[in-house]
Swiss-Prot record:
Natural source organism: Laribacter hongkongensis (strain HLHK9)
GO biological process: cell wall organization; peptidoglycan biosynthetic process; regulation of cell shape
Family classification: Belongs to the D-alanine--D-alanine ligase family.
Function of the molecule: Cell wall formation.
Disulfide bond sites: none
Swiss-Prot/TrEMBL keywords: ATP-binding, Cell shape, Cell wall biogenesis/degradation, Cytoplasm, Ligase, Magnesium, Manganese, Metal-binding, Nucleotide-binding, Peptidoglycan synthesis
Protein name stated in the entry: D-alanine--D-alanine ligase
SUPFAM superfamilies (UniProt xref): Glutathione synthetase ATP-binding domain-like, PreATP-grasp domain
Binding site for Mg(2+) 2: E270, N272
Names of the cofactor(s): Mg(2+); Mn(2+)
EC number(s) stated in the UniProt entry for this protein: 6.3.2.4
Record flagged with keyword Metal-binding: yes
Chemical reaction(s) catalysed: 2 D-alanine + ATP = D-alanyl-D-alanine + ADP + phosphate + H(+)
Amino acid sequence: MNETMKSRFGKVAVMMGGNSCEREISLMSGQGVLNALRGQGVDAHAFDPAEKPLAALQSEGFDRVFIALHGAFGEDGTLQGALETMGIPYTGCGVMASAIGMDKWRSKLVWKAAGLPVPDFRLLADDSDFAAIEAELGLPMFVKPACEGSSLGVTKVRKAGELAQAYAEARKFDPLVLAEQFVGGGEYTVALLEGRALPAIKIEPATEFYDYDAKYFRDDTVYRCPAGMDDEHELAMRRLAEQGFAVLGGSGWGRIDFLVDEAGQPYLLEINTAPGMTTHSLVPMAAREAGLTYEALCLKVLEAAHVG
């Protein structure tokens, strides 16, 4: 342990694991962060809320929390609210931005109300007119749980009559289910650090779309950073990412995913307020392109820990 780092950050809990469907990914992210912080002399310790109560943060004398949890409880505002009441600084977005960002439906409503471009979408229910929605949004389309991450429960609907089955699959993960217009010009993501956009990344999945397997385990998913856009389109996407982040009240760091149409127009897809930090993760990739090592990125995120 480095005394300078001790005085700077105190005792740090790297919050990882948890009970969400994304536990496995969270453990990978958290271990990477833990190793990076310890390697720079930070007094960092693993903390799994599935194994011990949050009250242990106070009883064990932790001074700040690096949130490496994904999904429910970790990035939906619940944990953030608990840490606020304890007065313990934490990384990433606050309560409101985390809660809205976890909900793909409500975040799209906010972006749309702010005049920012989003793919057309519908909220589905048991009594929805699925045939009418297929006609309105067109095929193919995506169906996804509104409050689940890592593409869990996502289905690409290709043929008329398949929407009801896709809805039933998504309902296994969340009661709120979204149908979303397909935009076919490419998938991109933009990481944000301290409110500023990092270089965009183009995602070329080996699977038909960027699913759970492609995100975390396949080695044939192609990531291009620089993304290969001209300066005008790159800057426009970065600017839109910063706007989308600010409108939701984002702080610290995050990542916004985009779809681009055939004319090059970017559409805000969803926000990730507790991005992955695994070997396949995208924020570290964008940070490297901007001249930041993984270790430096972890320190920058930790430095921005806050209450309120």
